């Protein structure tokens, strides 16, 4: 799977499904579930490493976990899902040269075929443009951008007219820069629909309604493994309680033997 395949999926109106993964087991499960894209997201800082936000995640962390995820794949190379790695906080906000160096390390050192970059501010636009010119595919990410939570919080974006116009303009700019896809997070459904219909690249939603070209979810949220669930992700099972109860049964039974 290559980034260009997702663009072709949109042309064919084929829904794109993505999940996050953080180790070989979650990577293997995602592959066996037949997802199109596996995102090694900076959410692993909280899901896997116990941090309270995505900000502490390092470049070394993302490289380590991206390789772990890929080792879980068992299908033929051409049948494996596309792997996209998040660029951690301060690996692309530090100037074009450093961003190229850090993104290059991710692509060179892992099986990732693209990186995801949050935001569309003028300085981020320059970074994205440079990365793409250097041959590194980029997935954009606008709306709620968790790496900016200290400034904007974690509230829903695009609820005012000004905010909606800003997000629409950012999406258009990201396509013009050459992004192969854009993640829209926690914005109104109809805004996502308007953006999707105005662009030729696929729009992947998370908390952006069902009109998008595809959906991505944090696997741990979907499986109910986290104590704090985002408002836009309804768990399909209460995984944490299920595993806890079953393990407690085993512990109690072993104590009686």
From Swiss-Prot:
Top-level taxon of the source organism: Bacteria
GO CC field: cytoplasm
Keyword Metal-binding recorded: yes
Catalysed reaction, written as an equation: 3-methyl-2-oxobutanoate + (6R)-5,10-methylene-5,6,7,8-tetrahydrofolate + H2O = 2-dehydropantoate + (6S)-5,6,7,8-tetrahydrofolate
UniProt cofactor note: Binds 1 Mg(2+) ion per subunit.
Keywords for the protein's UniProt record, in alphabetical order: Cytoplasm, Magnesium, Metal-binding, Pantothenate biosynthesis, Transferase
E.C. number(s) listed in UniProt: 2.1.2.11
Protein name: 3-methyl-2-oxobutanoate hydroxymethyltransferase
Organism: Prochlorococcus marinus (strain AS9601)
């Amino acid at each position: 799977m290559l980034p260009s395949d997702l663009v072709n999926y949109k042309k064919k109106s084929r829904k794109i499904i993505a999940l996050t993964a953080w180790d070989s087991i979650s990577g293997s499960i995602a592959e066996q579930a037949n997802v199109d894209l596996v995102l090694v997201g900076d959410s692993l800082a909280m899901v896997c490493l116990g941090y309270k936000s995505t900000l502490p995640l390092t470049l070394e962390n993302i490289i380590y976990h991206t390789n772990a995820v890929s080792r879980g794949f068992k299908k033929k190379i051409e049948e494996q899902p596309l792997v996209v790695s998040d660029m951690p906080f301060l690996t692309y906000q530090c100037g074009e040269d450093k961003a190229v160096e850090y993104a290059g390390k991710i692509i060179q050192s892992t099986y990732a075929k693209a990186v995801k970059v949050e935001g569309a501010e003028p300085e981020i636009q320059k970074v994205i443009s440079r990365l793409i010119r250097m041959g590194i595919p980029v997935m954009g990410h606008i709306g709620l951008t968790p790496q900016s939570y200290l400034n904007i919080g974690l509230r829903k974006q695009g609820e005012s007219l000004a905010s909606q116009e800003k997000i629409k303009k950012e999406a258009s700019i990201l396509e013009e820069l050459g992004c192969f896809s854009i993640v829209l997070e926690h914005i109104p459904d109809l805004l996502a629909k308007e953006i999707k219909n105005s662009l030729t690249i696929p729009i992947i939603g998370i908390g952006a309604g069902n009109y998008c070209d595809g959906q991505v979810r944090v696997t741990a949220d979907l499986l109910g493994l986290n104590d704090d669930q985002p408002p836009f992700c309804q768990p399909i099972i209460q995984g944490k309680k299920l595993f806890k109860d079953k393990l407690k049964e085993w512990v109690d039974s072993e104590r009686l033997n």
